[in-house]
Structures are given as C-alpha cells and as structure tokens.
Amino acid sequence: MSQLYRHSNKITLQGAVAGMLSGIAAAMPGAFPYVYGIWSIPEAKLRGVCPLTYGALVGASCGIAMCWGKIRNLTLAGVVGFASSLFALYVSWVIWILHLMFPSFWIFNPIRLALQPKVLWKIVVATNAQGTWSFKGSVPMTGTGLWLVWLGEAGLLLGFGVLAAIAMVKRRPLAVNDVSGLLHFSLEGRIVRC
C-alpha cells in the first residue's frame, strides 16, 4: 500500500451540481465589481488583475462546493470550473455592454440582454468596430488588436477559473472508505494511524 494520498476519482452528482451552482452564484454578483474594476483602473497593465481575480473567485467557489459534494476527480473539477467560468465570462460581457450603453447607472437588470445572445453579439461586433479600449490614452484599439485583447482577457478568466477549481479539490484529502475515523492525514499527505 502506498504511503501517499491519492485522490479516488470519485464522482457524485450532487457534487457536480453544487459546484456548478456555486460558480454561477459567485459569477453573478462578482461581475459587477469585475466590470467596475475594468472601467475604473486607469493603468492597462493593472486591469489584468481583474480577470485573474474574477476567474479565481468563481473557480474557488466551484471547488469548495465540489469538496463539500465529495468530488475527487480533477478532470471533473476542471470541466465544472471551466463551465462556471464560461458562464461568468458571458455575465461579465452582459454587464460590460450595459455599462457601456448606460454609464451613469451601476444598478440595472441584466437579464433582458442576457437572454438575447444574438443581440449581445451584434453589440459586441459593433463595439469592436468603434473601439473602447486604449493603451496609455492613445486612439481606441479596434479590429483584430481588440479581439486579441478580449481573447487574452477571456483566457485569463477561464484559465484561472479552472486552476482554482482544481486546486480547491486537490488541496483537501478525503478518506472516503474510512467510516471508523481511524485514519488521519498529516500535512505531508502521509497516512497516520491513530
């Protein structure tokens, strides 16, 4: 028997559902400060912290819920983290477009636009043609350059969402078959008999 802990790759339906719902629950209110940070931070390089933080928040929320649901499969943790982060990206786009259209309002109902993805896509394409993002106060970036910036932002958000979900599931060992409570795990991951 190996003296190091290895995940059992156990999957439970309630764990996957709890992870997804927790990620969605973190994504909706988290989109508002994320978009506020993107709009408010004047330094373009510091804006990169926003998608990292938002993605990590959504992924960590998923991972904690999956730990509660006894998910020990890292692949499933990554898939649920990716799906929740993708939802978070969509919600952030809805909030961002609404703030672009109504800059004086920070409290609004995003559901109407969120339920119309074709309309949202048309607005995104039109926004790309006009440009909204500039580097050091220059002319707003448009076209391929802006698509690449948005793609990088999406990659950071999705990547850190997946990594945080996997890290949360991976960090916590669970003795699934140990109902007697005689096995405990030390900080090094070794099994200690009591």
Question: Where are the regions a protein language model picked out?
Answer:
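Short, Lys/Arg-rich, polar N-terminal cytosolic tail immediately upstream
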Residues: 1-10
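Membrane-helix interface and helix-disruption motif detector
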Residues: 34-51, 72, 144-145
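Canonical alpha-helical transmembrane segments
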Residues: 50-80
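Transmembrane alpha-helical segments of multi-pass membrane proteins
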Residues: 76-93
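Juxtamembrane/interface segments at transmembrane-helix termini
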Residues: 94-104, 163-179
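Alpha-helical membrane-embedded segments
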Residues: 140-168
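Membrane-cytosol interface motif
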Residues: 176-192
